[in-house]
Amino acid sequence: MASFDEAPPGNPKAGEKIFRTKCAQCHTVEKGAGHKQGPNLNGLFGRQSGTTPGYSYSAANKSMAVNWEEKTLYDYLLNPKKYIPGTKMVFPGLKKPQDRADLIAYLKEGTA
């Protein structure tokens, strides 16, 4: 598995397309929007896992105490259930390093 340090540069436009097709069914990035099946991702970077107000997280997600940054998201998005065993997230992950880098680039812009 390539580490985030070896990840290709991300393209936010490509990442937005990935978000719309693979993430938007369960998540939003819109400030002030309610939660969907998954939590609102606005303000994601620098936040600890399991701490978004108003969302009911799994015990595993709360106790893992991951600080969401580019590196942790890169690893998490490869295989969420392996990274946080017991997570409620059903998404199987993004296997391609470029897809993960693109999605993270979009999230950096879209959740700020």
From Swiss-Prot:
Name the job this protein performs. Answer: Electron carrier protein. The oxidized form of the cytochrome c heme group can accept an electron from the heme group of the cytochrome c1 subunit of cytochrome reductase. Cytochrome c then transfers this electron to the cytochrome oxidase complex, the final protein carrier in the mitochondrial electron-transport chain.
Do the record's keywords include Phosphoprotein? no
Q: Which residues carry this modification: N-acetylalanine?
A: A2
Where it mainly occurs, coarsely classed, is mitochondrion
Asked whether the UniProt record includes Transmembrane helix among its keywords, one would answer no
Q: List locations, semicolon-separated.
A: Mitochondrion intermembrane space
GO MF terms, alphabetically ordered? copper ion binding; electron transfer activity; heme binding
Q: What is this protein called?
A: Cytochrome c-2
Q: Which PANTHER family match?
A: CYTOCHROME C
Query: Which InterPro entries would you find in this protein's record?
Result: Cyt_c-like_dom (IPR009056), Cyt_c-like_dom_sf (IPR036909), Cyt_c_1A/1B (IPR002327)
Q: Could you tell me the keywords of this UniProt record?
A: Acetylation, Electron transport, Heme, Iron, Metal-binding, Mitochondrion, Respiratory chain, Transport
Gene Ontology cellular-component annotations:
cytosol; mitochondrial intermembrane space
